[in-house]
């Protein structure tokens, strides 16, 4: 007698996420700093309304539990394409992608923007370790819990270092890499890790200051009016208003930071190396060096852009990522 035949339906082509977040009267999540109300950039305001927190299990050092981790989730999760996962620069947040994220969605790419542990807008009142290993482990647990498929991992500046570090440890989680103005050859935080904590906290307070952030912004962008630079500076330091930020930054500084130069030659994933024509922070020569050391890479330059082309020239960045994802570029 024949056994019963079970017919298994194929997976649905897409899954639609339900977004649940408590918002204030202006639509901003209540966990964001009140200074969000002062931001003028309409792209930042729109993207801020989509920031959510999702529980990510984490076991590092003496920390055991779940971190309510801030990110921007795609409205629809596809099952037949690699998702695009956006990291951010050093000491920044997912709002860095305010001008690029909506264009990636328009290009029909499933896109996540994730706040690296210790930065962004997560709930870290019970502070876990925020060293490089913890940041890597947190990203892996988020990927394993929610994304679950090899991803196109995109990292600008120090975010490229985070991406290389992650890929070297969890190659199975990555389909392709996009490294934008990569700061991949820095040797950690150097002698900062030897500072007494009192001095480290003083340095972190300086890092948070508006004048220093404004100066960094002026260097980062090719050309933007002062009023725009001021607003963008406020966007870039918004996460610094989180109550745990100083402790997380000091923990990262004294941990030694990232040192991934020795991993680069072992990365064999297809990689798009992107450099900007007018980057005043990271030399284009480092992008060429990266191209030469990676086993499977191509290089493209973004015209009329400084260190953050995904803010200044988002259409060009989206075209590069879209073509790279579809195989047209490589």
From Swiss-Prot:
- Give me the gene this protein comes from: VTE7
User: Which organism is this protein's natural source?
Assistant: Arabidopsis thaliana
Q: List the disulfide bonds.
A: none
Q: What is its main location?
A: plastid
Position of the signal peptide? none
**EC number(s) of the enzyme?**
3.1.1.-
Keyword check for rRNA-binding: no
Cellular component GO terms, alphabetical: chloroplast envelope
Name of this chain's protein: Alpha/beta hydrolase domain-containing protein VTE7
Annotated catalytic residues: 157, 279, 307
Q: Name one GO molecular function term.
A: hydrolase activity
The record's annotation in InterPro entries points to: AB_hydrolase_1, AB_hydrolase_fold
């Amino acid at each position: 007698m024949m056994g019963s035949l079970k017919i298994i339906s194929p997976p649905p082509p897409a899954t639609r996420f339900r977004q649940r977040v408590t918002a204030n009267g202006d639509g901003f999540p209540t966990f964001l700093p009140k200074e969000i109300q002062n931001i003028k950039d309409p792209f930042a305001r729109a993207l801020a309304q989509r920031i959510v927190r999702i529980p990510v299990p984490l076991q590092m050092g003496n920390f055991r539990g779940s971190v309510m981790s801030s990110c921007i989730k795609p409205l629809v999760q596809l099952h037949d394409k690699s998702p695009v996962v956006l990291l951010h620069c050093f000491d920044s947040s997912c709002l860095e992608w305010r001008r690029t994220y909506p264009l990636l969605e328009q290009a029909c790419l499933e896109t996540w923007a994730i706040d690296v542990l210790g930065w962004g807008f997560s709930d870290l009142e019970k502070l876990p370790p925020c060293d490089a290993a913890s940041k890597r482990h947190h990203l892996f647990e988020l990927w394993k819990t929610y994304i679950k498929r090899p991803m196109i991992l995109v990292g600008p500046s120090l975010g490229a270092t985070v991406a290389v570090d992650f890929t070297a440890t969890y190659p199975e989680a990555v389909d392709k890499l996009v490294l934008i103005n990569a700061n991949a050859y820095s040797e950690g935080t150097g002698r900062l890790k030897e500072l007494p904590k009192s001095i480290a906290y003083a340095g972190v307070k300086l890092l948070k200051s508006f004048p220093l952030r404004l100066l960094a912004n002026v260097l980062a962008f090719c050309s933007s009016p002062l009023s725009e630079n001021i607003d963008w500076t406020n966007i870039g330091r918004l996460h610094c208003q989180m109550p745990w930020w100083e402790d997380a930054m000091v923990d990262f500084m004294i941990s030694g930071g990232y040192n991934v130069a020795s991993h680069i030659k072992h990365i064999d994933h297809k990689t798009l190396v992107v450099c900007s024509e007018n980057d005043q922070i990271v030399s284009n020569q480092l992008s060429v060096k990266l191209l030469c050391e990676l086993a499977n890479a191509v290089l493209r330059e973004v015209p009329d852009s400084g260190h953050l082309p995904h803010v200044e020239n988002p259409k060009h960045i989206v075209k590069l990522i879209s073509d790279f994802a579809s195989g047209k570029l490589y």
